[in-house]
Amino acid sequence: MDKPHTQIMSIWLIVSTLLLLLMIVVGGITRLTNAGLSIVEWNPVSGIIPPISSEDWNNEFNKYTASPEFKLINNQITISEFKYIFFIEYIHRLLGRITGIIIIIPFLIFCYLKSLTKLQYYRLLLITCLVVIQGFMGWYMVKSGLKETPYINHCRLAGHLLLAVIIYHQLIAELLIIIQPFKCYTLATSKANNSNSTSINVINLKIKLIIFNKIIIFLLYTQIMFGALVAGLDAGLIYNEFPNMGDSLIPIEILNQSIDFTMFDNQVLMQFIHRWFGILISGLIICYAIWLIILNKHALRGMGMVAACLVLVQVTTGIITLLYHVPILAALTHQVGAILILTTFLFIQNIVTNFELLH
């Protein structure tokens, strides 16, 4: 790919990544304000135009009054209050459409111009397919709350968030491949140290760093999933204390019952797992960050410091979110913090993967 195409693709991927990050934030706001069920239809094309006239608003409000959420929860809501939650969900859906267009249309143009390598084509095709699936996944999630029970299925919510994170991950990975910010980064300190034994040690170190980093990325995905389950179950609104859950570190509900296949529906268990799994991952990240700092290689040292700082902030925002009964700002900061930590480790993965050994 020539330089102009590389620059254009880099800008496209950066814009797509930022839009997706914004989508995740707005999705969090939608969940925290309970606005997700305010639009009871899915019209990918006609739904782009919002209600404008009083008649339009009355039509939308009448549709909402027929929904289980209105009948069982929000039957006192006014049309002014309805407009507020409607616009939050509308913005989320509109942003989803814009993000989809921004990702899909340029991809088709690049294909038409035949400016993609074979590997790029397949990687970007995967991203495009995931974006389309995400649109259907969003409606599949919302649809779960339009039945008798007016609550969005928490497992579908977790799937929707995880799919967004996977797309974000793939966009970041593709961007790093194109711009190659750490290409030819040298792990070895100098040519004088390039004996065979030193080269072997460096290779072993590189393998260890890659493996450990991938483990942390996997654990982060798992923790994000548990966070989504906690959000979907409103499990952050119980046991608003730390470190204890009631009279002990382990809540009595867990001590008095066996774990079965309904564990993902259990508010207490999900909060317990999310808080202590988070502490475990935070400890691993701090240890890994210290390791990177001790290696004293400029890019790794900097990333290690960033990772350590982010995880300390993340633990703090998590505790604040819990203690203060899930305030929107703290909860959003906590959600974005998880994405930023994941991003940091995607950058670290790129660094350690692109080490060039001196011979």
Swiss-Prot record:
Membrane protein topology class: Multi-pass membrane protein
Requisite cofactors: heme b
Subunit structure comment from the entry: Interacts with CtaB.
Record-annotated disulphide pairs: none
Function: Catalyzes the conversion of heme O to heme A by two successive hydroxylations of the methyl group at C8. The first hydroxylation forms heme I, the second hydroxylation results in an unstable dihydroxymethyl group, which spontaneously dehydrates, resulting in the formyl group of heme A.
TM segment ranges: 8-28, 94-114, 124-144, 159-179, 215-235, 276-296, 303-323, 328-348
Protein name per Swiss-Prot or TrEMBL: Heme A synthase
GO molecular function: metal ion binding; oxidoreductase activity, acting on NAD(P)H, heme protein as acceptor
Catalytic activity, EC: 1.17.99.9
The species this protein was found in: Orientia tsutsugamushi (strain Boryong)
Superkingdom of the organism of origin: Bacteria
Family designation: Belongs to the COX15/CtaA family. Type 2 subfamily.
Binding site residues for heme: 274, 334
GO biological processes: heme A biosynthetic process
InterPro entries: COX15/CtaA_fam, HemeA_Synthase_type2
Protein localization: Cell membrane
GO CC term (a single one): plasma membrane
Catalysed transformations (reactions): Fe(II)-heme o + 2 A + H2O = Fe(II)-heme a + 2 AH2
Keywords (A to Z) from UniProt: Cell membrane, Heme biosynthesis, Iron, Membrane, Metal-binding, Oxidoreductase, Transmembrane, Transmembrane helix
Pathway noted in the entry: Porphyrin-containing compound metabolism; heme A biosynthesis; heme A from heme O: step 1/1
